[in-house]
Structure formats: structure tokens, C-alpha cells
């Protein structure tokens, strides 16, 4: 039966009329009389909410997101963090290298990874990785007396790179100073066979500190120390990427990440330590032996030990709430999420409903999550614009139906608000990967992390995001007060998309800047293109049964 279904999809999809729309046949013109034709210019800009507590989940809301189990190992939110943002990937790798190169005796490196490869962190100056390669940098950390712990997903796509990284990292000799060592473990503690261990964090911490002003550093976002990722804002570095072994499946990479110095970094560290120390061991099945994913013997690691506050600091002006996803259907998160956690999902819903003026989404996917669609439709009448940048879905077989779920997310918004809502991608001939997982609302709220815009990231796969609100404010061209860091992040992303300068975009209202996307999409010198999304006749064959496998929504009820 499945063979017949796949053949049927293939036959329809390959036909010249593959863009045939059932809606066109049976009615339902996308520009019907019920559409709101406003382009946002007729809507008065409103002062956005500025208080972090207006955006963040309350302690009770976090508890509710965990099936009624309080979250005791992470703060509700933290203040006084110093955040550095990276809108282009080489910025991230330069910063990671500098931080790792400064580690000293007793320091700890905790890396949570979707994939790890022995790539150079600075391929533009060190293409062979002789000085900045992941293996060399980790060896230097251990030689100086630092320890390294890596939790890496059993990633089949990057298997050969992961195995090589595992073998190299686990073979690093113990430190001659204090016997510190490096250990990489493959982690398969997931709800289903198609799940991903998706958290992407890096923590650099002291073994202990009695300084009441000292705090660790953490990186949170969409990037791994892996192939394909290193790139610049111009996405024209094929020669460097090829010469250094960076290139894998793409010719460039878009992403987002932040560096946190402050108490929020402790939350990121605590998340890692709890996973590492779980009594349920990873990679214990015969599959792991067959695929060479077996792990070495290892020990529990101590929690980080700082005398400074777990909730406040004076290092910067940014307030941060760490949000997560752990499936409520997986029984082996008992130490840290016995009923799962979907605080990330709940935080996104709350933030969208707070929108006063605009929402900017840049994500690997933009597929149907019914609750997120409902929240967007709730605020669309009163905001000026919704701008989305995402990858196209061009094949019914890739991602098991994501082409349909993209249409289902886009169509209701586009039909009702054809001028307020615009969706873009990158030009196909550039062969770029949009891997970003970023939401910016009103230039006040920035969400960045590992979670994609799909159901599995919201409810099933292990994910970790940082929700950021900046107490340092600036006046926008519209005359309202906004957060300095979220606005700066957004402008730098718009530079990447449109090719316009920072100063030009800084002087524009959001509507004016958003209009530059349409200009850039028709300009061959930019990376941007319109994302064309159509209904296809074969969509009815992509059933909810398929969706429950490729994009599960894990929900549980407790009494």
C-alpha cells in the first residue's frame, strides 16, 4: 500500500501540472473579498512592551509547561547579563576560538551538539586547522588543565565526521597538570527513532569561583562546531570553505547565535550537567554497536560552583529566560523533566501575542504549528508586518510532507493579509542553507536557539533557546522606545538579506526596511528571493499519519 501511495505522489508531483490547485478548481481565491489589503502603512506604530516580565513566562507558567512539576535547576529568568550577538557565522567561530584559547587550569568546557567535526574555527587564516582546528583547540584546553565534556547526537547524516571527532577527542591525553581530560559521548536518549538531540550550547566555566562578581560564559543558538557552517555576510567564500574542508552539502550558511556572560550561562550549564549525569545511560543498544556509536566509560561531573548570584549580575543590561523542550512522552528524563517541558513553545506563544508592530521570523522551516498560526492570526489585524525568511520545500518526499505543512502554515495568513505578510528565501543558485532559528518582535524581544518552527521542536525534540529582552533602549525612527540589542540584531540580519548598509537601514522605519526585501529579491546581486508556495494535487496523500512521524506533536494530560 505504501509503495502505491509513493508511486501516486511521484506521478502527480512529476507531471507538468504539479502546481495544479484544488482550491482553484473548487473555489477559494487567495485574494477574496474577505482579505485585509493593508500593507501596514495605515496602522499607527504603538509603543512596544519593554519590561522583561511582560515577555517572559512566570514561574507558574514554567511549572505548567512541565506537567505541574516545578523547574528547580534553572532560574525563572536572570538579569544583568552581557550578551554579544552573532548574525553571521564567522563572528561566532572567531569568538568561540578566542574564549577557548583563553581557558586555564581548572576550567570546564561543556558542549552540547547536534554534530561535531574537526573543522578549523578560523579557516580564513588557518585553512588546515593546524592552530584553530577543533581537535587542536580541544587538545590545547586539556594541556592547560581544562576538562571537556561533549554530548553529541547519534547523527547519521554527519556520522563519519562525528566518529572521527569522537575518536580524536577521546584520544586526547590527560593533562600533565591535573589529569583533566576530554570525553565525547553519543546521546540517543530520545522519544522516537526519528527524533533529534538538537540542543546546541557551549559553556566555558571555572571549576569553582569565590568571586561574587564572576560568572561563566555560554553560547546559545543554531550553530555547531561542524562542517558547512563557517561563512561570512557576503556568502562568497567557496574557495576558503573548499580549501579548509568546511564545505559539505551547501555553498553557504545563514544562522544566529549569542554569547552570554552572566547568570543565564549557569542555567545553560545546569541543563547540560543534568543530562550528562542522568542515570539512564546513552548508547546502550545493539544498534549503537553496529553503527560504532558506543561510548567509553565515563563519570558524573560536578555542578558548576560559583559564589555569585544565580539570578542577577551587573555585567550587562540583558535579561534572559532559558526555555527548553523535552518530550512528555519520553520516560527517561526523570531527573530534570519527568513530565517533559515545553516552556519554549509557551514562551513563543506568549511573545507573539505581545506583538504591537511587527514580527520577523528567520528559520530553517516555517511549517504548520496550529497554536502558533492561531497566535499570529490573532495579532495580524493590529501589527504592521510579518516578514518570514525560510527554506523552500520543493519535494514531497523530503522531510516526509513538509511541503504540505509549509503551505498549510502560509496559506491562511497570505489569504487574509496578502500585503502585510511576505515570505522570502535565498536564491536557488547560491545553494545556501537557512539554518537560523530566530524570532524578533517589535525590536524588543529576541528569541534565538536550537528550536525550529515545527511541532517537533516545540514539543518533542530536546531544544534550548534564550529569550532576550534588553534594558538598554534606543529611540526608533518611528519615535518609539525599543531594545538596543534586538534592534541591532535585526538590522544586521537585514543587511545580510538586502545588501543595504547598516546606516541606511538604521535610519529606516521597520516598514521602510521591510520594503527593501522586495527590492532585494529582484536584484541579482543579493542572496534574497521570493518564496513561492503553491497548493499541489498530491497533498491529500500526505496524511496526518505521515505527519505524526515526521513532525510529531507530543502532548500529555495529567490529573
Task: List where the protein language model places each region.
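Classical eukaryotic N-terminal signal peptides for Sec-dependent ER targeting/secretion
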Residues: 1-8
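N-terminal signal peptide
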Residues: 9-26
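Extended rod-forming repeat segments used as scaffolds/tethers
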Residues: 11, 231, 470-472
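A generic structural signal for solvent-exposed, polar alpha-helical segments
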Residues: 13, 61-62, 236, 282, ...
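Accessory carbohydrate-binding/adhesion or oligomerization-edge regions at the termini
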Residues: 22-27, 42, 268, 276-302, ...
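HKD-type phospholipase D/PLD-like phosphodiesterase module
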Residues: 25-26, 33-108, 115-354, 362, ...
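Long, C-terminal catalytic modules of enzymes
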Residues: 223, 251-252, 370-373, 393-394, ...
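Long hydrophobic segments that form regular secondary structure
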Residues: 344-361, 365-372, 377-384, 558
Amino acid at each position: 500500500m505504501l509503495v502505491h501511495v509513493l508511486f501516486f505522489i511521484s506521478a502527480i508531483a512529476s507531471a507538468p501540472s504539479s502546481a495544479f490547485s484544488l482550491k482553484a478548481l473548487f473555489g477559494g481565491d487567495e485574494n477574496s473579498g474577505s482579505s485585509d489589503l493593508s500593507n501596514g502603512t495605515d496602522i499607527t506604530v504603538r509603543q512596544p512592551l519593554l519590561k522583561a516580565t511582560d515577555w517572559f513566562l512566570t514561574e507558574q507558567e514554567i511549572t505548567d509547561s512541565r506537567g505541574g512539576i516545578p523547574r528547580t535547576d534553572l532560574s525563572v529568568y536572570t538579569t544583568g547579563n552581557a550578551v554579544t550577538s552573532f548574525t553571521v557565522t564567522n563572528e561566532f567561530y572567531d569568538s568561540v576560538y578566542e574564549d577557548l584559547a583563553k581557558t586555564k587550569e581548572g576550567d570546564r568546557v561543556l558542549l552540547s551538539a547536534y554534530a561535531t567535526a574537526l573543522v578549523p574555527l578560523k579557516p580564513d587564516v588557518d585553512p588546515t586547522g593546524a592552530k584553530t582546528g577543533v581537535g587542536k583547540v580541544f587538545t590545547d584546553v586539556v594541556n592547560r588543565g581544562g576538562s571537556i565534556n561533549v554530548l553529541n547526537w547519534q547523527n547519521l547524516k554527519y556520522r563519519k565526521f562525528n566518529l572521527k571527532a569522537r575518536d580524536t577527542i577521546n584520544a586526547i591525553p590527560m593533562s600533565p597538570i591535573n589529569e583533566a581530560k576530554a570525553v565525547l559521548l553519543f546521546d540517543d536518549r530520545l522519544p522516537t527513532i526519528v527524533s533529534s538531540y538538537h540542543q546546541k550550547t557551549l559553556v566555558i566555566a571555572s571549576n569553582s569561583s569565590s568571586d561574587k562578581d564572576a560568572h561563566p560564559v555560554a553560547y546559545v543558538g543554531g550553530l555547531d562546531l561542524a562542517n558547512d557552517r563557517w561563512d561570512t555576510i557576503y556568502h562568497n567564500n567557496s574557495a576558503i570553505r573548499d580549501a579548509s574542508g568546511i564545505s559539505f552539502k551547501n555553498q553557504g550558511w545563514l544562522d544566529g547565535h549569542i554569547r552570554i556572560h552572566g547568570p543565564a550561562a549557569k542555567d545553560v550549564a545546569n541543563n547540560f550537567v543534568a543530562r550528562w549525569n542522568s542515570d539512564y545511560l546513552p548508547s546502550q543498544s545493539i544498534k549503537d554497536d553496529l553503527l560504532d556509536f558506543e561510548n567509553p566509560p565515563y563519570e558524573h561531573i560536578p555542578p558548576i560552583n560559583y559564589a555569585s548570584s544565580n539570578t542577577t549580575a551587573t555585567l550587562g543590561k540583558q535579561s534572559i529566560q532559558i526555555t527548553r523542550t523535552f518530550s512528555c512522552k519520553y520516560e527517561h528524563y526523570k531527573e530534570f523533566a519527568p513530565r517533559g517541558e515545553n516552556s519554549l513553545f509557551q514562551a513563543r506563544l506568549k511573545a507573539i501575542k505581545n506583538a504591537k508592530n511587527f514580527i520577523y521570523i528567520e528559520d530553517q522551516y516555517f511549517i504548520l504549528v496550529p497554536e502558533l498560526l492561531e497566535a499570529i492570526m490573532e495579532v495580524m489585524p493590529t501589527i504592521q508586518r510579518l516578514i518570514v525568511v525560510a527554506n523552500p520545500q520543493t519535494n514531497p518526499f523530503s522531510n516526509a510532507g513538509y511541503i504540505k505543512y509549509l503551505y498549510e502554515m502560509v496559506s491562511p495568513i497570505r489569504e487574509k493579509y496578502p500585503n502585510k505578510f511576505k515570505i522570502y528565501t535565498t536564491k536557488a543558485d547560491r545553494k545556501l542553507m537557512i539554518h537560523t532559528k530566530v524570532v524578533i518582535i517589535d525590536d524588543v524581544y529576541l528569541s534565538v536557539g536550537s528550536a525550529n518552527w515545527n511541532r517537533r521542536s516545540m514539543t518533542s525534540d530536546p531544544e534550548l533557546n534564550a529569550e532576550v529582552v534588553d534594558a538598554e533602549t534606543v529611540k526608533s525612527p518611528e519615535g518609539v522606545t525599543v531594545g538596543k540589542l534586538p534592534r541591532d540584531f535585526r538590522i544586521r540580519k537585514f543587511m545580510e538579506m538586502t545588501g543595504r548598509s547598516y546606516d541606511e537601514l538604521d535610519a529606516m522605519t521597520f516598514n521602510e526596511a521591510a520594503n527593501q526585501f522586495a527590492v532585494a529579491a529582484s536584484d541579482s546581486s543579493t542572496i534574497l528571493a521570493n518564496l513561492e508556495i503553491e497548493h499541489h494535487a498530491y497533498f491529500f496523500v500526505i496524511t496526518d499519519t505521515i505527519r505524526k512521524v515526521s513532525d510529531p506533536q507530543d502532548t500529555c494530560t495529567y490529573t
